[in-house]
């Protein structure tokens, strides 16, 4: 028999998901304001961060996978970053058509400047929150993301 009602946990999670949607929008808006003076947007900053985190040049498809984003969207942003001299493309010895994205010195400087701006912003945002609550939230988000990435989402029931 199909479920007709959310469980208490399902109801709470549904509310949390709606709040996370709103939070994501607010984070992007706030991030855009924070890094606008650097000629960046939150989306560009996010891509630069993925490149830095990767620690070695990767193709756009891999960056998109790491970000959980559509390859076409990441490609568009990477093309903009390349046009502005923040990244460059190098030949991929393993795949002729999938060029590697490489951070330039200008890109590294822009990312580092963004992170310097982020430091007081994130510390102020965290003010008054307990480390335990932040760690619990991080655990919940990581668990949910893992379930969705691994295809553990529940099958639709008719």
Predicted regions and their residues:
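Charged, amphipathic alpha-helical coiled-coil/dimerization segments
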Residues: 2-4, 28, 79-139
């Amino acid at each position: 028999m199909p479920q007709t009602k959310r469980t208490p946990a399902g109801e709470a999670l549904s509310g949390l998901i709606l709040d996370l949607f709103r939070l994501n929008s607010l984070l992007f808006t706030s991030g855009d304001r924070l890094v606008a003076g650097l000629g960046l947007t939150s989306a560009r900053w996010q891509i630069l961060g993925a490149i830095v985190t990767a620690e070695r040049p990767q193709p756009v498809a891999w960056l998109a996978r790491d970000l959980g984003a559509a390859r076409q969207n990441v490609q568009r942003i990477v093309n903009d970053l390349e046009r502005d001299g923040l990244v460059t493309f190098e030949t991929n010895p393993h795949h002729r058509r999938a060029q590697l994205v490489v951070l330039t010195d200008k890109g590294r400087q822009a990312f580092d400047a963004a992170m310097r701006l982020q430091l007081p912003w994130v510390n102020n945002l965290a003010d008054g929150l307990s480390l335990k609550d932040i760690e619990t939230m991080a655990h919940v988000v990581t668990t949910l993301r893992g379930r969705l990435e691994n295809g553990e989402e529940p099958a639709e029931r008719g």
